[in-house]
Amino acid sequence: MTLDGIFFWFRAVPILLLILIPLVLVHEFGHFLTARLAGIRVLEFGIGFPPKAKVIGHDHETEYTLNWLPIGGFVRLEGEESESDDPRAFSNASLPRQLVVLAAGVTMNLLTAVVLMFIVAWVFNPVLEPSVGSVQLGSPAEAAGLHAGDILVSVNGSGHTSQLLDFGAPDPSTPMRDQLLANQGKTVTLVVRDTSGHERTLDVTLRVPTGNQGALGVGVGTAIVYTPGDPVNAAGQAVSGTWKALGLILVALGDVGHQIATNPTQAPPGVAGPVGIAEEVGNVVTQDNGPMLLLLLAAVLSANLALVNFLPFPPLDGGKAAVMIVKKVFGKKGVGALETATYLVGFALLMTFIAWISFFDILRAGTSGP
């Protein structure tokens, strides 16, 4: 690994932890708050994972701790892992109260995703617009005075844009290329905005392209442009964006399941584990839009935490809820040993899955290099 690569990871990993730790703590705070409101005894709220480094505070029943492994946090409830005689134990709470406490972490992560996307939509309101990536020598674009970085606002009055938070929407550069190609050999009215924000209206005669030439003679890319936002529109974008992000995450999880079942020796497309996410963070922070993209990445990660924890797979919250329901239906004694085995197997499978994803992350990072 080169020196630049070492600096890349030394920068990326701490930033990822600064994103993930608050998201996990928000999740755990949901469990903590609802447990308190439900009258369930909370023994410990920990930042990081044991071994314990320091007790940073306590009240009449809860110890607040700082732990040595800085990878999240946890809430320890009386009677969560085993039966307890304490009437305020989690194991003695009614099923509805247990389910509310388990669902609170997912709910907090969903709300966090919406809030972060709201901030992105209101403060930045990022829009994707087709842009000029490069200009070919002797092309109609060069003759018209186009430069790299210019925004292609419209062709014959027709423009192509999309909201960055509209996940899954078509890249606006594609219909722009198609429109230019459809008008090859014709004179079109082209509206262009330069990097200073000045717009020009140009009459440009497009060529009939040969080989790798384009009709205009530019490499059409996509630029992120900030536009004025308002809170009402931002709220709609935030809710819609979170919903669409959940849909894409669900599709990705389905693709991973299919990949594992059919060809586990190949990397799952479009899916990253901790190493891949750290690499993405490292790439994002070097971009001009780094702060906005980090906020958006945090929102997507929060939505991802919510959806993954909702899955009915022990030891995730959804799996715990499923076990609670089974215990209610069949009785605690009938599923006691099975519950322990289920958690152990589920945890082992979860760790194996993370290791599997991370293996391909490391391979990709090693071949591409930061």
Model regions and ranges:
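Alpha-helical transmembrane segments of multi-pass membrane proteins
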Residues: 20-24, 109, 113, 300-309, ...
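Final/C-terminal transmembrane alpha-helix of multipass membrane proteins
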Residues: 340-361
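Membrane-interfacial loop-to-helix junctions in multi-pass transporters
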Residues: 8-12, 287-297
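Transmembrane alpha-helix interface/packing and boundary motifs in multi-pass membrane proteins
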Residues: 261-264, 285, 301-316
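PDZ peptide-recognition modules
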Residues: 2-12, 81-96, 104, 108-269, ...
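Small-residue-rich helix-interface/hinge motifs
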Residues: 7-86, 308-330
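Membrane-interface alpha-helices at helix entry/exit sites of multi-pass transporters
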Residues: 333-341
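C-terminal transmembrane module of polytopic alpha-helical membrane proteins
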Residues: 358-370
